[in-house]
Amino acid sequence: MLVLEELDECLPGRNHVEEEVEGKLLTEAINRFLEGIPEHSRNVFVRRYWYLSPVKEIAQEYGMGQSHVKMLLMRTRQQLKQYLEKEGML
């Protein structure tokens, strides 16, 4: 990004700035995606990938089998990938 090159003299490492901007944009896109999916799917996804909860623990908390949790996570990841591709993030 040419605009970020203007910050080269006052910030350490331009790549760091670009990574920060890209990370922020990606975070915003993921948040939009999560807002658009069912609450149950969102909760399971956040527990697994934000709080790093084991599948077994998530299954117990939500009264689901571990295979059901794994399937739900796989489908949500697929939906997220499609969403990020549509948004031009991938």
Describe the residue ranges of each PLM region.
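Short helix-coil-helix linker/hinge
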Residues: 24, 34-42
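A short pre-motif secondary-structure segment
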Residues: 44-48
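Internal acidic/polar
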Residues: 1-23
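DNA-recognition helix of helix-turn-helix
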Residues: 30, 41, 55-56, 60-86
